[in-house]
Curated annotation (Swiss-Prot):
Residues 73-161 form a coiled coil. Belongs to the SEC2 family. One of its GO terms (cellular component) is cytosol. Interacts with RAB3A and IHPK1 through the coiled-coil domain. This interaction is competitive. IHPK1 kinase activity is not required for this interaction. Pfam families: Sec2p. It comes from Homo sapiens (Human). This is Guanine nucleotide exchange factor for Rab-3A.
């Protein structure tokens, strides 16, 4: 609805009333003129119609602009809300991803720690099992060694009890000590030597050496007895102590000093280590061992002396599979030294329960056997 004349700044044309219109006849055939009132009404209607058209157009434009602005504002608000909601969701997702990442890192760390702990525990268990196995094997080996040693000592003790006789034995109770001319033939079965292998401390009975007259005088050597008592206070197998050093120099060394020096050194070391074995000769084929150009596999040649003798025994050093045939004389010398070492080992281990003087005389008897064997005296074998 039009409310008044338009303002000059709106660019609308001036009203028709302000424009002078000349009087002119529009129809030459018309013989009269219109009245001024009718003309004024017609001009006013046209003017009103001309003014309402641009105002309506401007109003429509304004309305369109207002609607467009409203649509833009609503679209902008909607987009802002969508952006805000998307940012919020993205933030939540980022937080969730960060939380899940922390959980994953924690799980990975726990898994790594658990794996390391399992490996460490497994390694510890394996190490403990290996240590227990090694300890068990060591104990088993020691137990077997002790069993072997005890068996050898029992055998040696039996032999020592059998072969040890008093200085003046009762020949009526022991007819085997009589000479063959006085003893006469004996009925029944006689003892024969065992054919099984025997360790060196348990071989060669020494009864043939210990025959002494009924009235044998004895006197203790004070120097030897003092050295023995000093050794007895702290028994040892160290050859540097005065007591054993004298025995080595006077008895053991000369008794084991054979022609074949190389083999003599090995035999002496085996006797000291208690690893020498003496066995009776068997009929099976044996490996040949050469020592200083002497055929040690022959039963007619002694590997230690190099002399041609009937060899009824052979020796083996330690765990070696090689054997050396020895003559009766060489065997007697070796067994005499073995008997001495066996007895001093018993003293060292506390197995001999005697006073100092009886122990001293037993050692002197064993030294006497070594001296006799070195000089070539040995019992004849049946």
């Amino acid at each position: 609805m039009w409310s008044g004349p338009p303002q000059p700044d709106q660019g609308l044309p001036p009203p028709l009333a302000a424009v002078p219109v000349p009087w002119k006849s529009t129809d030459p055939c018309q013989g009269h003129r219109e009245s001024p009132g009718a003309l004024v009404e017609t001009s006013a209607g046209e003017e009103a119609q001309g003014q309402e058209g641009p105002a309506a157009a401007q109003l429509d434009v304004l309305r369109l602009r207002s609607s467009s602005m409203e649509i833009r504002e609503k679209g902008s608000e909607f987009l802002k809300e969508e952006l805000h909601r998307a940012q919020k969701e993205l933030k939540l997702k980022d937080e969730e991803c960060e939380r899940l990442s922390k959980v994953r890192e924690q799980l990975e760390q726990e898994l790594e720690e658990l794996t390391a702990s399992l490996f460490e525990e497994a390694h510890k268990m394996v190490r403990e099992a290996n240590m227990k196995q090694a300890a068990s094997e060591k104990q088993l080996k020691e137990a077997r060694g002790k069993i072997d040693m005890l068996q050898a000592e029992v055998t040696a003790l039996k032999t020592l009890v059998i072969t040890s006789t008093p200085a003046s034995p009762n020949r009526e109770l022991h007819p085997q000590l009589l000479s063959p001319t006085k003893a006469g033939p004996r009925k029944g079965h006689s003892r024969h030597k065992s054919t099984s292998s025997t360790l060196c401390p348990a071989v060669c009975p020494a009864a043939g050496h210990t025959l002494t007259p009924d009235r044998e005088g004895k006197e203790v050597d004070t120097i030897l007895f003092a050295e023995f008592q000093a050794w007895r206070e702290s028994p040892t197998l160290d050859k540097t102590c005065p007591f054993l050093e004298r025995v080595y120099r006077e008895d053991v060394g000369p008794c084991l000093d054979f022609t074949m020096q190389e083999l003599s050194v090995l035999v002496r070391a085996a006797v000291e280590d208690n690893t020498l074995t003496i066995e009776p000769v068997a009929s099976q084929t044996l490996p040949t061992v050469k020592v200083a150009e002497v055929d040690c596999s022959s039963t007619n040649t002694c590997a230690l002396s190099g002399l041609t003798r009937t060899c009824r025994h052979r020796i083996r050093l330690g765990d070696s599979k090689s054997h050396y045939y020895i003559s009766p004389s060489s065997r007697a010398r070796i067994t005499a030294v073995c008997n001495f070492f066996t007895y001093i080992r018993y003293i060292q281990q506390g197995l001999v329960r005697q006073d100092a003087e009886p122990m001293f005389w037993e050692i002197m008897r064993l030294r006497k056997e070594m001296s006799l064997a070195k000089l070539g005296f040995f019992p004849q074998e049946a």
